[in-house]
Regions:
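Intrinsic disorder in cytosolic terminal tails and internal cytosolic loops
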Residues: 200-221
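Symmetry-related core transmembrane helices of the 12-TM Major Facilitator Superfamily/SLC fold
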Residues: 181-198
Length: 221
C-alpha cells in the first residue's frame, strides 16, 4: 500500500505534480505529431518516427549530465528549467506547424524539447527518492511511475479531444489547426508543471524515521 503520508511532503507531492503535467503535455503532443507526419506530410510510420528522433534521443546524451548537475545545483532549478524548455518547445511547434512546414523548421524545437525532457528525468527521480526513507524508495518510485503513466494517458485523451473539437481529418488544414491548438494546450500544461517544480522546497534531506510507523521488516524480524 502507498502511504498517504508521502503526500504531506511538499517535495514529493510537487515532484509528482510536475511529473503528471510533464507527461500530459509531452505524450499528448508526440501522439499528435506522429499522426501529423503521416496524415498531413505523407511519411510512413517509420519515417514519422525517424523525424521525432531529435526529440526522443536527446535524453540519452543529456540525462547523465543533468543527473550529475543535480548533485551540485538545486534539483528544482534543473527540473524547472527542463519543464520550461519543454513548454517553450511545444509552443514553438504549435506556432510553426502547417501542412507545408519544412522539416528543417521543426528540428530546432525538437532538440529544445529533447533537452528539456532530459533535464527533467534524472533530477525528478532523485528528488522523489530523496523525499522518503531508504526502505520506502520502492513505493515512492512506483508511485511516481504510475503518476507519469497516468499523465501520459490523460494527455493523449485530452489533447486528442481538443484536436477533434478544433480540427479533425476533414482536410490537411483542419488537421494542422486542431493539432496546433492541442499542442499549445500541452505547452500551457507543461508550463504549470514548471511552476510546480520551482515551488518545491530546496531541501533534499530525507525525512526522519517516524516512531509511530516502525519499519515493517524490523517488526517481522
Amino acid at each position: 500500500m502507498l502511504p498517504m503520508r508521502f503526500f504531506r511532503n511538499r517535495v514529493f507531492t510537487l515532484a509528482n505534480v510536475a511529473s503528471l503535467l510533464m507527461f500530459f503535455g509531452m505524450f499528448g503532443s508526440i501522439f499528435l505529431l506522429a499522426q501529423f507526419f503521416q496524415t498531413v506530410q505523407g511519411y510512413s510510420p517509420f519515417g514519422a518516427g525517424l523525424r521525432i528522433l531529435p526529440w526522443t534521443l536527446a535524453p540519452m546524451f543529456i540525462a547523465p549530465v543533468a543527473g550529475a548537475l543535480s548533485d551540485r545545483i538545486s534539483p528544482r532549478l534543473i527540473i524547472g528549467l527542463g519543464l520550461t524548455l519543454q513548454s517553450v518547445a511545444l509552443a514553438w511547434i504549435g506556432l510553426v506547424s502547417t501542412p507545408t512546414v519544412p522539416y528543417s523548421q521543426l528540428i530546432a524545437p525538437f532538440i529544445v524539447a529533447g533537452v528539456g525532457m532530459a533535464l527533467f528525468f534524472a533530477p525528478v527521480a532523485n528528488v522523489v527518492l530523496s523525499a522518503v526513507r531508504p526502505i520506502e524508495e520502492g513505493k515512492a518510485s512506483g508511485a511516481n511511475n504510475t503518476i507519469r503513466e497516468l499523465g501520459g494517458v490523460f494527455g493523449v485523451a485530452v489533447l486528442a479531444a481538443v484536436f477533434s473539437h478544433v480540427g479533425g481529418y476533414q482536410s490537411l488544414e483542419a488537421f494542422s489547426d486542431g493539432m496546433n491548438t492541442a499542442v499549445l494546450v500541452g505547452a500551457a500544461v507543461v508550463a504549470l508543471g514548471a511552476v510546480a517544480a520551482f515551488a518545491m522546497p530546496g531541501s533534499g534531506r530525507r525525512p526522519e524515521i517516524e516512531a509511530a510507523e516502525p519499519d515493517p521488516l524490523a517488526q517481522a524480524a
